[in-house]
Regions:
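Alpha-helical transmembrane-bundle signature of multi-pass membrane transport and export proteins
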Residues: 3-454, 458-460
Length: 460
């Protein structure tokens, strides 16, 4: 008699043992860039594009504060940067799953190169409406670019390259923030904001040219079905994506990590206000803002590298790191808000954003490893929509707290830090529940196998 239960028992025990074994080591950063041409050129595009982004960002904040002198104008720019994604992401996710992600990225870069040149026409306070409109347009096309890029990365790197690939992307964003914020502040302060906008436009063109050299593998064809109005508008695909997430609690939890971080996103408005009112450098708001964003960039650059070395790359290790990262962000934002020393404020700001970059990279990898390719575009677009919604709301609330209610930027920052502690606590409680369920699974299966073996023995 063939003991099917024994075979099943062997498979289950093998799976348990495999979880205890150390996974194959991932590749090094330089090795990945040398050996993977597709990722290398995608990364080159990210380098030049994001450098220009920060030239643009510092210049826009400088224009708003110079023309209006109001922190509300900065908050409205933040809202204009975030809300397009909320509206467009459901459609952009469907498009990223239907069409060539390479083409989507190239087209988005070209359009953004044209849009940012519109900032050259803003010269008077009564033209601030144009700043908001151009910001909405620029970020609307970013809402097509980002989900396509994030969904495409697992297609051009192997599973063991996934963590270092996302770490490189995060570190690059951070380094470009550091260099771009510093250089953007210098260029805007020394040569004027128009120079920053022209440079940003050129970087979008360069990014499009670099991405055009990347060859993505052909994706599996979607099953053909009758075209309906719902399918044509992307409604059917959006509902399908929502159904996919709803029936996978872990995917939902991973998807909510960045939106939870985004609930404290009002810190971006606060950094602009701190740079102008509390920590101006040589009396210049643009330079003060640039230095603060530079400290933010340094923290986000080193966070994933340190976390990868200290915590490891298994699923459980990354889950633990996400919870710790939330607590880091909250604790050091509180310290930043109450710090009277500019130097210590920069240190605390960098440490807070170390936490932010850790949870950003690891939640991305957890999603990329868990979500099927034909759903990635919609899942990452939904994530982006939720992030931008929470960040837009947070920035608007922060602006109102300071302008309408007259609350000190320091107290608002400390409040943001306290708020950040709550998602960290909730994450650890959720992880604890997952761990209990996993520990209960194996004994239950072992008992089932034992009963099956006993039944087969009696039959013999």
């Amino acid at each position: 008699v063939h003991l099917h239960g024994l075979s099943f028992f062997h498979i289950e025990m093998s799976e348990v043992a495999s979880k205890k074994r150390v996974s194959a080591p991932s590749v090094g950063y330089l090795e990945l860039l040398r050996s993977n041409r597709g990722f290398r050129f995608l990364w080159f595009g990210q380098v030049v594009s994001q450098m220009g982004d920060w030239f643009d960002t510092i210049a826009v904040y400088t224009i708003a504060l110079t023309l209006t002198g109001s922190s509300r104008s900065v908050a409205l720019i933040m809202v204009a940067r975030f809300l397009p994604s909320v509206v467009i992401s459901p459609l952009s996710g469907v498009i990223a799953d239907r069409f060539s992600r390479r083409t989507i990225m190239i087209a988005s870069d070209i359009v953004r190169a044209i849009v940012v040149l519109g900032f050259l026409f803003v010269r008077r306070p009564d033209q601030m409406w144009l700043v908001y409109v151009l910001t909405v347009l620029q970020l609307a096309f970013s809402a097509f670019f980002e989900p396509a890029k994030t969904a495409a990365i697992p297609s051009i790197v192997s599973d063991r390259e996934l963590v270092p690939a996302n770490a490189i992307a995060s570190v690059t964003w951070s380094v470009m923030l550091t260099l771009g914020a510093a250089m953007g502040g210098f260029v805007a302060g020394s040569f004027g904001t128009n120079a920053a906008f022209v440079l940003d436009s050129l970087t979008f063109v360069a990014s499009a040219l670099l991405i055009s050299t990347v060859r993505f593998p052909k994706r599996a064809e979607r099953p053909k079905s009758k075209l309906t109005i719902g399918k044509a508008l992307g409604i059917t695909d959006t509902i399908e994506g929502a159904h996919y997430v709803r029936h996978r609690p872990r995917v939902l939890a991973y998807l909510l990590v960045k939106p939870a971080w985004g609930m404290g996103g009002g810190i971006l408005t606060l950094l602009a206000v701190f740079g102008e009112r509390i920590f101006p450098v040589a009396g210049k708001a643009a330079t003060g803002i640039g230095v603060l964003f530079t400290a933010r960039g340094i923290g986000t650059a080193v966070g994933p590298i340190i976390a990868r070395r200290w915590t490891g790359e298994t699923r459980k290790q990354m889950q633990t790191a996400v919870g710790i990262a939330f607590l880091m962000g909250g604790t050091f934002y509180i310290a930043f808000g109450v710090s009277r020393s500019f130097v210590w404020a920069l240190v605390f700001l960098a440490l807070a954003h170390m936490g932010g970059s850790i949870l950003w990279v690891f939640s991305t990898v957890l999603l990329q490893k868990t979500v099927a390719d034909n759903f990635r575009g919609r899942v990452f677009a939904a994530e982006m929509a939720l992030v931008t919604l929470t960040m837009a709301t947070s920035n608007y609330v922060v602006g109102e707290l300071m302008d309408r209610f007259g609350i000190s930027p320091r107290w608002v920052t400390a409040g943001v830090g306290i708020f950040f502690l709550m998602p960290g606590i909730a994450w650890f409680l959720t992880k604890q529940r997952w761990d209990r369920k996993e520990r209960a699974v194996v004994p239950a299966k072992v008992q089932d196998v034992a009963q099956q073996l006993e039944t087969e023995r009696l039959e013999i």
